[in-house]
Curated annotation (Swiss-Prot):
Coiled coil: none annotated. One of its GO terms (cellular component) is cytosol. Gene3D superfamilies: 3.40.50.1360. It catalyses: 6-phospho-D-glucono-1,5-lactone + H2O = 6-phospho-D-gluconate + H(+). This is Probable 6-phosphogluconolactonase 5. InterPro entries: 6-phosphogluconolactonase_DevB, Glc/Gal-6P_isomerase, NagB/RpiA_transferase-like, PGLS. It comes from Arabidopsis thaliana (Mouse-ear cress). One of its GO terms (biological process) is carbohydrate metabolic process. The gene is PGL5. Catalyzes the hydrolysis of 6-phosphogluconolactone to 6-phosphogluconate. It holds the Pfam family Glucosamine_iso.
Length: 252
C-alpha cells in the first residue's frame, strides 16, 4: 500500500488550487482509460475547498457527465437538514456542475429522514454491490474490496476521518463495506461510514487539512504515527497524499 506523502502549501487558497488540479488530472486519466471516474467526497470544509473546480479552466474542461459521486460518510438526517453532507455538497459543488443525477449516490432519502442508521448503512452497501455488478465500481484484485479512483478526505481536530472516531469500534470493522455509528462524539450522533478497508482500497486518497485546530493531531500522525488516531491508518493502493496549509503544519 502507498506510503504517506505530505505537501504543505503557504495558503488555503493554494491548497484549494492544487486539489482542483489533482482532481482534474485524475479525472482525465481515468476517463481516458475506462470511460468514467469514481469520486468519493466527505463533508465539512472540504466542499468549500473544491470551489476551484467550478471555475475556469476546470468547469469547462472536465467531462462531468462521466463522473460517479459517492460519500465516504454521511449524517443520518433528512437531505435538507443543515447537517447533511449531501446538502452541503449539492449546494456548494454538485449543483454547479453537469453530473447526471443518476450518477450521484446519496444516502437513502427516506431512511435517513427516519433516522435509521443501521438500515441506511445496509442499503448503501447494497448500492455499492449493485454498482460492482454493473461494472461501475471494480473489486480490487489486491484488496478484495471496492476500488474507487479518488477519495477526498478531511481530518477533525481529534484525528477522526470519515465517521471513524478515536476509541470507537468501527475502525476495526473488516467484514462490512459500510458501517454505522449512533454515538458519534461530534453531533449529529447517527452516521454511516465506509469501513477502513474500503477507504484504503481506493487508488488515490487525498487528505486535505487546514487551520490550526487539527495541527496537534497532524503532528502526532506525522512524527509518531499515533495509531490511536483513525487518520493515522489511512493508506491507498497508488497514492496517499496529505495536503496541509501552514496552520495545519504548524506543530511539525
Amino acid at each position: 500500500m502507498a506510503q504517506r506523502k505530505m505537501i504543505v502549501f503557504p495558503t488555503k487558497n493554494e491548497l484549494s488550487e492544487a486539489m482542483a488540479e489533482y482532481t482534474a488530472n485524475l479525472s482525465a486519466k481515468f476517463i481516458k482509460e475506462k470511460g468514467l471516474f469514481t469520486v468519493v467526497l466527505s463533508g465539512g470544509d472540504l466542499i468549500d475547498w473544491l470551489c476551484k473546480l467550478v471555475q475556469p479552466p476546470y468547469i469547462d474542461s472536465i467531462e462531468w457527465p462521466k463522473w460517479h459521486v459517492f460519500w465516504v460518510d454521511e449524517r443520518v438526517c433528512a437531505w435538507e437538514d443543515p447537517d447533511s453532507n449531501y446538502k452541503l455538497a449539492m449546494e456548494g459543488f454538485l449543483s454547479k456542475v453537469p453530473i447526471p443525477d443518476k450518477n450521484i449516490y446519496a444516502i437513502d432519502k427516506h431512511l435517513a429522514a427516519d433516522g435509521n442508521a443501521e438500515h441506511c448503512a445496509t442499503l448503501y452497501e447494497e448500492c455499492l454491490k449493485n454498482l460492482v455488478k454493473e461494472k461501475i465500481i471494480p473489486i480490487s484484485k489486491k484488496t478484495g474490496y471496492p476500488e474507487f479512483d479518488l477519495q477526498l478526505l478531511g481530518m477533525g481536530p481529534d484525528g477522526h476521518m470519515a465517521s471513524l472516531f478515536p476509541n470507537h469500534p468501527q475502525i476495526n470493522e473488516k467484514q462490512k463495506w459500510v458501517t454505522y455509528i449512533t454515538d458519534s462524539p461530534k453531533p449529529p450522533p447517527k452516521r454511516i461510514t465506509f469501513t477502513l478497508p474500503v477507504i484504503n482500497s481506493t487508488l488515490y486518497n487525498l487528505m486535505a487539512i487546514c487551520d490550526k485546530a487539527p495541527a496537534k493531531s497532524v503532528a502526532e500522525i506525522m512524527k509518531h504515527n499515533n495509531l490511536s488516531l483513525p487518520s493515522a491508518h489511512l493508506s491507498a493502493q497508488v497514492e496517499n497524499v496529505w495536503y496541509l496549509d501552514q496552520a495545519a503544519a504548524s506543530e511539525l
